[in-house]
UniProtKB/Swiss-Prot annotation:
Organism of this sequence: Oryza sativa subsp. japonica
Domain Protein kinase as annotated: residue spans: 22-313
Domains (record comment): The TXY motif contains the threonine and tyrosine residues whose phosphorylation activates the MAP kinases.
Any GO CC annotation of this UniProt entry: cytoplasm
Coiled-coil stretches: none
PTM-bearing positions, type Phosphotyrosine: 186
Name the UniProt record assigns to this protein: Mitogen-activated protein kinase 16
Gene (name only): MPK16
GO molecular function: ATP binding; MAP kinase activity; protein serine kinase activity; protein serine/threonine kinase activity
PROSITE patterns noted in UniProt: MAPK (PS01351), PROTEIN_KINASE_ATP (PS00107), PROTEIN_KINASE_DOM (PS50011)
Maturation and modification: Dually phosphorylated on Thr-184 and Tyr-186, which activates the enzyme.
Length: 501
């Protein structure tokens, strides 16, 4: 070991200091794509979620999806989008198979919140929707279409903070991108799919496809169940027109799919159902906005920015405090335009991982080939911890984690310029007051589960992971945003209501 230390590799190996930084405590979720574990950040004492993605390169299509999501989550840094904190450096540049991604912690997802709570207040609905639209405003400003918005892809915590995740189906729109190529792999969840996607209705798609999904999610908050649970495409269109009425002749004439055009043209005329009848007891202003979001014709839907100016958000929205992203460079997604081999995707993912290892990035850019490491990496140690804990889970035991074996002193990760505190951290609606530090679940006044810490997504999405939360103490937020959010919270004490205790 001493001889190796003298070879100049300690500085290289010191990038693996994060191997000692995270101590895996338990496996908390398993899916077809990997394992999610809770871990402790030994530098801060806070807990994080670590997602291990197995055999990333077994299928190139899956590896490309992971590459796309890692890249987008790096480029789209916003309080309402789930954040990758770190990615472990693999032990070999050209031979690694698994990826370990460290995420911020969220307790549950919007699907579970809606399912477990039949007494969410209008204030909850408003705040959830505001954050969702604010995140989509940022995403769309970057010319990104999410394409798979649904409650399970909206993570949530006990403070009613929500964050958009699962960008595996997302695409960046460029002016010269052929729409036929752009949308050929669209397979998003049918219940939240815009009508123009149900039958390839229109030749040019817009961010309005995401706005429709936001409307479906908002309606589900109000109803407590999905609005359009279609069994197939035809049934989906029937459910839409049952509520919204038959589309206009002008809308039908612009549909490019002949079968869909003929089906809607021959459909019996259906009257529009008043939303006040479909959603009895709902806030009239909420229903007015919902009608705009669920316009059958995409040109009639508001943009996310326009929706945020709706009177429904009076006293809450402030366009000056809503960040706007710059369009993403076409070069970032050049790989979408060519056929990739397994080694191509591996190299591209490795390049993304280096974004979280600044010193290694410099060596990489200088042409230093570090394909064979002299020391076991943090990933190697995590493999042992995961294997140990998974074995206990398989046997039904409450397995204790292996003791860490320090091979070097922990070193602080180099902070990137984009590492900033969440400017909305102080603006929250408590779902429950009195939770003891360290508890892993939240209950409402009826002592029923509110946000279960065991509701983990089984998604191939790298961001679809939830773990037990012990919210880390954040540094002071940016002054302007903090003041704004505190003013909003102080100014509407009853509006930001708590559930009954």
């Amino acid at each position: 070991m001493d001889a190796k230390k003298g070879s100049g590799e300690p500085e290289f190996f010191s990038e693996y200091g994060d191997a000692s930084r995270y101590e895996v405590t338990e496996v908390v979720g398993k899916g077809s794509y990997g394992v999610v574990a809770a871990a402790v950040d030994t530098h801060t004492g806070g807990r994080v979620a670590i997602k291990k993605i197995n055999d990333v390169f077994e299928h190139i299509s899956d590896a490309t999806r992971i590459l796309r999501e890692i890249k987008l989550l790096r480029l789209l840094r916003h309080p309402d989008i789930v954040e990758i904190k770190h990615i472990m450096l693999p032990p070999s540049r050209r031979e690694f198979r698994d990826i370990y991604i460290i995420f911020e912690l969220m307790e549950s997802d919007l699907h579970q919140v809606i399912k477990a709570n039949d007494d969410l207040t209008p204030e909850h609905h408003q705040f959830f929707l505001y954050q969702l639209l604010r995140g989509m405003k940022y995403i769309h400003a970057a010319s990104v279409f999410h394409r798979d918005l649904k409650p399970k892809n909206i993570l949530a915590n006990a403070d009613c903070k929500v964050k958009i995740c699962d960008f595996g189906l997302a695409r960046v729109s460029f002016d010269d991108t052929p729409s036929a190529i752009f949308w050929t792999d669209y397979v998003a969840t049918r219940w939240y799919r815009a009508p123009e996607l149900c039958g390839s209705f229109f030749s040019k798609y817009t961010p309005a496809i995401d706005i429709w999904s936001v409307g479906c999610i908002f309606a589900e908050m109000l109803m407590g169940k999905p609005l359009f649970p279609g069994k197939n495409v035809v049934h989906q269109l029937d459910l839409m027109t049952d509520l919204l009425g038959s589309p206009s002749g002008e809308t039908i004439s612009r549909i490019r799919n002949e079968k869909a055009r003929r089906y809607l043209g021959n459909m019996r005329k259906k009257p529009r159902v008043p939303f006040s009848q479909k959603f009895p007891g709902a806030d009239p202003m909420a229903l007015h906005l919902l009608e705009r979001l669920l316009a059958f014709d995409p040109k009639d839907r508001p943009t996310a920015a326009e929706a945020l100016t709706d009177p429904y958000f009076t006293g809450l929205a402030n366009s000056e405090r809503e960040p706007i992203a710059q369009p993403i460079s076409k070069l970032e997604f050049e790989f979408e335009r060519r056929k990739l081999a397994k080694d191509d995707v591996r190299e591209l993912i490795y390049r993304e991982i280096l974004e979280y290892h600044p010193q290694m990035m410099q060596k990489y850019l200088r042409g230093g080939d570090q394909s064979n490491f002299l020391y076991p990496s943090g990933v190697d140690r995590f493999k042992r911890q995961f294997a140990h804990l998974e074995e206990g889970v398989a046997q039904g035991d409450k397995t204790s984690p292996q003791l860490r074996q320090h091979v070097s002193l922990p070193r602080e990760r180099v902070v990137r310029n984009g590492d900033e505190p969440d400017p909305t951290a102080d603006y929250c609606i408590k779902l429950h007051v009195g939770e003891q530090p360290g508890h892993s679940s939240v209950t409402d006044g009826l002592n029923k589960p509110l946000l279960s810490a065991r509701n983990f997504l089984k998604s191939e999405s790298i961001g679809a992971s939830q773990c037990v939360v012990i919210k880390e103490k954040r540094e002071k937020d940016e002054e302007s945003m903090s003041e704004y959010m505190n003013e909003a919270a102080d100014g509407v004490p009853h509006k930001i209501a708590q559930l009954k205790t």
